[in-house]
């Protein structure tokens, strides 16, 4: 009887298989599946088609396309799997709906809103204003995204930094040349998806819609930013490069515009621009913070995180994260990591991890050395780096000056410059030597182009930072065998993790708590922490600026 039942079940299964084959040959359809597969299966569409045909009973000839909707890697155990959500197109090709397109209108003769700063907050504010029928007038202190690249190259050649055109200032902001990571902890899925779709509309790969930790790549992002600017211009908006805001124009407690210096020509000109102001100047615009403090415009000190940029050979991180001496192999991407712990009452964590990337010089002025990281789209260099930073709260710095956290940053950056021979050469130390309070007599080959100089970071950096980093590194080394090693090098100093102040605004209308018509925006105002969250905040500020104009 058991054998007969088994034969009956097999017969039923075979009949259903034949039914599916016949149905597929006769009709068009799409189906979605959640699957967990080996990396080689997820590697390309051909492999996925073969897998789905075998596992789901499809005729391979009828599968026209497989679109990956979501992708994440499960590397918690020795056997690595890729979790996928896929859409299978049977007897039909997908429509041109890989991303949701936003319609932008002509706003040539519409009311103006001044957007100060063309980083992600300013760009997305500007595009949202156009959606809402308003005309953005963008003021960017730096150069366009292509020209600023030339100035960044000069940092390595001349060991000097242009204070208006560098890795922080210029079209696209600090994020334009720091990997283009789009991962966010925001739970607001709708706004996050909108930001990603706008990037796709302007040339980013649609893979960012699927990846759990999406990134565009520092080599691809400039073209996307350029396309976003062209949308602004094509719709009747304005973009003014090398135009730095110097002050707000006030009518009592109402902001009606800004004054700015136009530095595009040999003779600088002072210009005035009128309209409500979205202030999206980024976390490194210290002249703006000083102006706001001097003008008694309400702000508060905000905590940041400070530390170093830590660089390992990428193959070592691959071996650790993928539990395999052969590393990532052919089918896996360069490995990422994320570490967090508590040390002496403060959080210590990895920040802005860049697999297969470079460490870059991110100073914005003379006599300072600052590090950051970036990765190309293929994440293909021989190094992987991350900020390793310690939480610094306002109460950790003496005094009640609103700008005391900023002054702490400035002192550490200046000390780093002094330790680097008063150039952009960065002081550095092998990781295990640092933990054991030993000077590194030599340094490993590293990606930091201006060069490294061996330096006892454990000795001259603030003990508030070094003691906590030493404790945290021991913890991370226990969590990931091989992570704490002298193959890794610490490069000082990582200080620009977020804004050192928060410009106070109303929770409901996002306007400054006292000044009507001023909308502090995104990371520079203390309300975002990365490209996506800055973009979301930019869109929200644009919506509130639109509502404000409707009322006046």
Feature-to-residue mapping (PLM):
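Mature extracytoplasmic/luminal segments of secretory-pathway proteins
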Residues: 5-6
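Residues forming the flavin
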Residues: 29-82, 86-177, 181-552
